[in-house]
Structure formats: C-alpha cells, structure tokens
C-alpha cells in the first residue's frame, strides 16, 4: 500500500518539474541510483553475482522500463492525472491476456469480466478525452503504451529475480534505463538541467526508491489479488491531486469509467495469481 501511495504522487512531481517530461524520468532514475545501492547494501544483497543471462535480462528490463517511463511522462504532461495513473497500470490486464495466450486456453468468467470492465471503462475515458481535445487523447494513448511496456518489464524482472534480491535487480535496471532516457530527452530537444531540484528529488525518492522498491518487494511476499486491491489507491490519490491542485474536475461518467477500469485491474490481478501468472 505504501509503495502504491508513493507511486501515486509521481505524476504530481512530473508536472511540477521545470525540465522536460523525459528529462524528469532521467533524473528520477539517476538520482535514485545511490539510494538503491545503499538499500541493497543494508539488505545484505550484493550488486554483483549475476550470470550472463541474468545481466542480459536485467539490462533488457532496464531499457523497457526507460521506454515505459518516457511514454508515461509524456502522457502525464498531456492527459488528466486519473487517466494517466489508470492507463499506466493497465499492465494487470495485459499480463492476464499474456498468461492466457501462454497457457493456450480460453478465458474463464472472471477473466472475461476483467476484460469487459477494463475495455468498457477505457472506452468511456477515451471517449471523454476525445471530447476534451486531441492532446488529452494522445496523452491517454501514451499511458496505455506505458502499460504495455511495464508489463514486459515485470516479466523480465520476474525471470531475473530467481537467484538475486530485489534491490540489486532494481539498481541495475535503473542503471541500464538512465542513459536511454537521457538519449531520448536530448533527441527531443528537452531542457535537461532543472532550475528547481526538489520535485525531482521527491520523484526519485518517492517513486523510484520507495514506490518501485516496495512493489518489487511485494511481488515476493503478497498475493497478486492483494497487490491489485492496493493498486486502486494510486488512481484515487491521483484523481484527488488532479482535482484540487490542477483543477481537473470530473463528471459522473468519468467516475464510471474509472471504476470500471479499476474493477478490471483488480479482477485481472486476481486471475494472474493462479494459472495465468505461472508462465511469467
């Protein structure tokens, strides 16, 4: 729950940063590296000891995580915070579908319900974004892409996690992802150096160290259904921040879309805790 709450405040920090959206993602990773190394040391988890396959998996995961963050931060800049958080967490449904494909079986009732709720809610939210403007719709699509990329990032981390602890995994994935984000920011012509550092420090500490660290830790200690229920705290906090800080008022149809997507995510998490999650 604490990890999800920390992650929920990430979009607020992205909006407040005075550098570009991809640049803020670069600083999120770069500033977090010393803290991640310290956490690994205090946990007694050495940063080395990976096999060649392990190094390759973690490096690939880091690249996917960088692309996920770039896409998500671009989406946060364009769409409403509630939409950005829900669509950015759409990996639960994508992971469930991946598991069904890997198992070569048809969805069960709960899985059909997860798909129906998620797709129905997404259609409502995307329709509302079309009404608001093209920029908002583009932001939604960036966040959905981020959900796809985050799914495969988690799949690679789960494969690499077998012989090592959570902190070394997160450290090396972060180390691999930072240069990718810097390259994208420079190609986009974004300002990289900020004038005000505190939003980036909050982003690095809250999202990358506390948020990501606790979520990766929770993968080992809690059921996917529990994680899915805790996940709902993210969009709830993001909606409140968007409403009170950025004046992103919602109408009843927005709440309906968000509830449907949230229900789909929880049902998908519950499904991935059984057969659907086994191939990962």
Where are the language model's segments positioned?
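Hydrophobic transmembrane alpha-helices of multi-pass small-molecule transport proteins
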Residues: 36, 40, 59, 65, ...
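Specific transmembrane alpha-helical segments of multi-pass solute transporters/efflux pumps
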Residues: 6-7, 11, 43-82, 88, ...
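Loop-to-transmembrane alpha-helix entry segments
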Residues: 28, 52, 85-88, 104-124, ...
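Glycine-/small-residue-enriched transmembrane alpha-helix faces in small-molecule transporters
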Residues: 1-26, 60-63, 67, 71, ...
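Helix-helix packing/entry segments at the starts of transmembrane helices
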Residues: 84-90, 157-178, 208-244
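Transmembrane alpha-helices of multi-pass small-molecule transport proteins
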Residues: 19-67, 94, 98, 148-156, ...
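Hydrophobic/aromatic residues within transmembrane alpha-helices
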Residues: 17, 24, 28, 59, ...
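Specific alpha-helical transmembrane segments that line the substrate/conduction pathway
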Residues: 23-34, 73-106, 146, 224-243
């Amino acid at each position: 729950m604490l990890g999800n709450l920390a992650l929920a405040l990430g979009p607020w920090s992205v909006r407040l940063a005075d550098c570009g959206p991809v640049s803020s993602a670069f600083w999120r990773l770069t500033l977090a590296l010393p803290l991640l190394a310290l956490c690994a040391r205090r946990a007694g988890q050495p940063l080395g000891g990976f096999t060649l396959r392990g190094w390759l998996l973690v490096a690939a995961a880091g690249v996917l995580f960088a692309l996920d963050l770039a896409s998500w931060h671009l989406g946060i800049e364009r769409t409403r915070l509630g939409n950005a958080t829900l669509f950015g967490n759409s990996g639960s449904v994508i992971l469930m579908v991946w598991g069904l494909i890997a198992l070569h079986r048809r969805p069960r009732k709960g899985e059909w319900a997860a798909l129906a709720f998620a797709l129905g809610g997404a259609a409502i939210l995307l329709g509302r974004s079309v009404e608001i403007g093209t920029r908002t719709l583009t932001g939604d699509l960036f966040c959905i892409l981020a959900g796809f990329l985050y799914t495969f990032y988690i799949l690679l981390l789960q494969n690499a996690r077998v012989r090592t602890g959570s902190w070394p995994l997160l450290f090396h994935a972060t180390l691999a992802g930072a240069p990718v984000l810097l390259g994208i920011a420079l190609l986009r012509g974004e300002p990289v150096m900020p004038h005000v550092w505190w939003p980036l420090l909050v982003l690095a500490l809250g999202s990358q160290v506390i948020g990501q660290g606790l979520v990766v830790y929770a993968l080992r200690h809690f059921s996917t259904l529990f994680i899915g229920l805790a996940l709902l705290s993210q969009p709830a906090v993001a909606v409140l921040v968007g409403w009170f800080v950025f004046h992103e008022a919602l109408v009843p149809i927005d709440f309906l879309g968000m509830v449907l997507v949230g229900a789909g995510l929880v049902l998908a998490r519950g499904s991935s805790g059984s057969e659907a999650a086994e191939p990962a």
